[in-house]
């Protein structure tokens, strides 16, 4: 790289692992990484937090937004519609509490995570919090008799899948609670199984059940899911995380339920079993994005193969330019401890290095003792990992992967990201209504943050799904003269960037705008020094 001219501001971006990012080979890139190099100022990876009892008050939600939460996830495997409606209200109240300052305002998206066609156990002794100890070698009867629905104990376990006796064989395994408890089927009757406890432990109420290898014939969208999705449309959620997606037609079913009123809701398919991994390409095509749901996936396929599935899915999503979320057990130990294990720190960083657009927290924020610390930890790790990306190689490969496209917006996006590397731009400013222009730029993974200015609130909230997009909502009325309206929005982005420390006077930014009103006309690129 040639040295920047002396009249150019000393953009912070020139120091961050830049030496490593521009290496010629991957080995050389690794050799040049430097622990004393500062991290990226703007975090490019989205942080998704599951909201539960530990985090649903407006006060804690405000702190979580300050700490870096971009998307609030509501898990519909638990809780009533009233409970979730209140949580959504609280998330929005917390978000709007920052609305008076357009520079500091951060739109937060709401995601509905469906229960999906899952199998769950009944209540232990009639209580949601009771637990029983299952001893290794003990006999446990699994029954479909509804008399035991709320009377499970260490001898009898009820579950809600009526065809279990048809799909499992003697010698099959039944896993409960993310695989913590494993049962071996010894004999089967018409409506019961006799199993031996292979791996014991304490069993709580309403735990998930996995039947690896069994051809489970549950519908893609259950009756409960239909009610939940309709509730989501009424509540104006921004995205749906669809559980246990096995094929493209499952995604179409979810879309059908969302209907005309929910047509702008993004559908993120959760890949949680062998069939989903096998039919990944058709699912990716039908979806707006993908979640690598490592919890159930790690039971349905061997645990030592999960990383292969993760890398394959992230790679294919990056190639297709669709968002991908890495989830489950990212900072699991922080449910009970204030610091993560070294392995967890590594895991979060490697998910970012693999190319994940977003990283997710589940129990850490929903029920953990340290919800804020977990968000801050993900924020810090993501910034370090982003600085350490092998940007030069990544950009070359992304361009090579899409060289035959004649899409004008794609050409603009590619050109602007290339220019941002050449002039060491501190940010890319994109004016967008539908968000498409910003998504295309994000696809080429610039080092610098993409400040996307929009008047559409939903566009701003959904932009968090894409790596590198920093959405800014313009609340000023549209100016009559198009050129003045463009200047108004670019100035807003400049002010936000300066206030957030992304750049300062004299740095260079790249500005992408349309030369006339109307969606789809982002076709002008300017290289502008920051005033």
UniProtKB/Swiss-Prot annotation:
GO cellular component, one term: nucleus
Protein residues bound to Mg(2+): 272, 296
Binding-site residues for substrate, renumbered to this chain: 73, 270, 295-296, 328
Residues recorded as bearing Phosphotyrosine in the entry: 105, 148, 175
Residues annotated for ATP binding in this entry: 75-78, 120, 207
Protein name listed in UniProt: Pyruvate kinase PKM
Protein role: Catalyzes the final rate-limiting step of glycolysis by mediating the transfer of a phosphoryl group from phosphoenolpyruvate (PEP) to ADP, generating ATP. The ratio between the highly active tetrameric form and nearly inactive dimeric form determines whether glucose carbons are channeled to biosynthetic processes or used for glycolytic ATP production. The transition between the 2 forms contributes to the control of glycolysis and is important for tumor cell proliferation and survival.
């Amino acid at each position: 790289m040639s040295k920047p001219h002396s009249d150019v501001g000393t953009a912070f971006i020139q120091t961050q692992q830049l030496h490593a990012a521009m290496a010629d080979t991957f080995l050389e890139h690794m050799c040049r990484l430097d622990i004393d190099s500062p991290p990226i100022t703007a975090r490019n990876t989205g942080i998704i937090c599951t909201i539960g009892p530990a985090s649903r008050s407006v006060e804690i939600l405000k702190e979580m937004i300050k700490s870096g939460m971009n998307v609030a996830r509501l898990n519909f495997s638990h809780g009533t519609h009233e409970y979730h409606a209140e949580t959504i209200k609280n998330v929005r109240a917390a978000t709007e509490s920052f609305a008076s300052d357009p520079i500091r305002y951060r739109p937060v998206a709401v995601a509905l995570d469906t229960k999906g066609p899952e199998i769950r156990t009944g209540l232990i002794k009639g209580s949601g919090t009771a637990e029983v100890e299952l001893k290794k070698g003990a006999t446990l009867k699994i029954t479909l008799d509804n008399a035991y629905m709320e009377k499970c104990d260490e001898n009898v376990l009820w579950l809600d899948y009526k065809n279990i006796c048809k799909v499992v064989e003697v010698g099959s395994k039944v896993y409960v609670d993310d695989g913590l408890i494993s049962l071996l089927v010894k004999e089967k009757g018409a409506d019961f199984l006799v199993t031996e406890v292979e791996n014991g432990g304490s069993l709580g109420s309403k735990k998930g059940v996995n039947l690896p290898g069994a051809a489970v014939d549950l519908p893609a969208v259950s009756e409960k899911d239909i009610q939940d999705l309709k509730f989501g449309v009424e509540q104006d959620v921004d995205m749906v995380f669809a559980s246990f997606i096995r094929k493209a037609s499952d995604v179409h079913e979810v879309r059908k339920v969302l209907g005309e009123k929910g047509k702008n809701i993004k559908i993120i398919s959760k890949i949680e079993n062998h069939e989903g991994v096998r039919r990944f390409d058709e699912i990716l095509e039908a979806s707006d994005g993908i979640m690598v749901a490592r919890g159930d996936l790690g039971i349905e396929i061997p645990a030592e193969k999960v990383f292969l599935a993760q890398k394959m899915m992230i790679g294919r999503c990056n190639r297709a330019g669709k968002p991908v979320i890495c989830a489950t057990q990212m900072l699991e130990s922080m449910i009970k401890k204030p610091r993560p294990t070294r392995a967890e720190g590594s895991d979060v960083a490697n998910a970012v290095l693999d190319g994940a657009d977003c990283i997710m927290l589940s129990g850490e924020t929903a029920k953990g003792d340290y919800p804020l610390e977990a968000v801050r930890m993900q924020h810090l790790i993501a910034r370090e990992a982003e600085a350490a990306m092998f940007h030069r190689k990544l950009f070359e490969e992304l361009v090579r992967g899409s060289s035959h496209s004649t899409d004008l917006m794609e050409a603009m996006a590619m050109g602007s990201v290339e220019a941002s590397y050449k002039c060491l731009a501190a940010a890319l400013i994109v004016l967008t209504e539908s968000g498409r222009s910003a998504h295309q730029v994000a696809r080429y993974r610039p080092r610098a943050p993409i400040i996307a200015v929009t008047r559409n609130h939903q566009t701003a909230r959904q932009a968090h799904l894409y790596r590198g997009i920093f959405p800014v909502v313009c609340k000023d009325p549209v100016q009559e003269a198009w050129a003045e309206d463009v200047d108004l929005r670019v100035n807003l982005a400049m002010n936000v960037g300066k206030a957030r420390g992304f750049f300062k006077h004299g740095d260079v930014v790249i500005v992408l705008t349309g030369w006339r009103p109307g969606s789809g006309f982002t076709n002008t690129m300017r290289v502008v020094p920051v005033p």
